[in-house]
Regions:
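Conserved substrate/cofactor phosphate-moiety recognition/catalytic segment
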Residues: 1-24
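NTP-dependent small-molecule kinase module
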Residues: 91-148
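ATP-dependent NMP and nucleoside kinases share a basic, alpha-helical "lid"
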Residues: 23, 36-105
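Residues that form generic nucleotide/phosphate-binding pockets
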Residues: 18, 64, 68, 109, ...
Length: 148
């Protein structure tokens, strides 16, 4: 599937439906997902802004984001390009302007979500080794918080 700037509404729908199904059907605890329907909404919003996705699709995706929150205890945001060296690997986008736009969309969307639905958001912008350690610390914190 084409992703990032090369994605399409059709591809975003396939990805969105897969992500939603993956998290909503998983009954285990203590799981970290590296992508969520929130990610999908952000990339769909970027497509919408370019006129390449419909408002109907965007609204449908946001509705799924809000339902998706029932399955999340928190979100870890790792802004790309802030601490992660951009490498052209044919998977990730390396266009700094696009990445900055995506990072801004994430921040705006997470703030919007938090106005109506409190969600723990952790921003990690450090080296890979430190990200792994901090993710473990966040995991322990979330487990502690759930026991209270």
């Amino acid at each position: 599937l084409s992703i990032n700037q090369k994605s399409t509404e059709k591809n975003q729908k396939i990805i969105r439906d897969f992500l939603y199904k993956q998290i909503s059907e998983n009954k285990q605890s203590n799981i970290l997902f590296d992508r969520s329907v929130i990610d999908n909404y952000i990339y769909s919003l970027a497509l919408y802004d370019k006129g390449e996705a419909s408002l109907e699709f965007l609204n449908e995706t946001f509705d799924l984001v809000m339902r998706h929150l029932d399955f999340l205890d928190g979100v870890i945001l790792i802004p790309t390009a802030a601490s992660i060296k951009l490498v052209s690997d044919n998977l990730r986008d390396v266009d700094v302007n696009y990445i900055d736009k995506i990072n801004r969309y994430f921040i705006k969307t997470l703030l919007l979500i938090n106005k109506t639905r409190p969600l723990a958001v952790f921003v990690i912008s450090v080296s890979r080794e430190e990200r792994i350690k901090l993710a473990g610390d966040i995991h322990r914190y979330m487990n502690y918080k759930m026991r209270l």
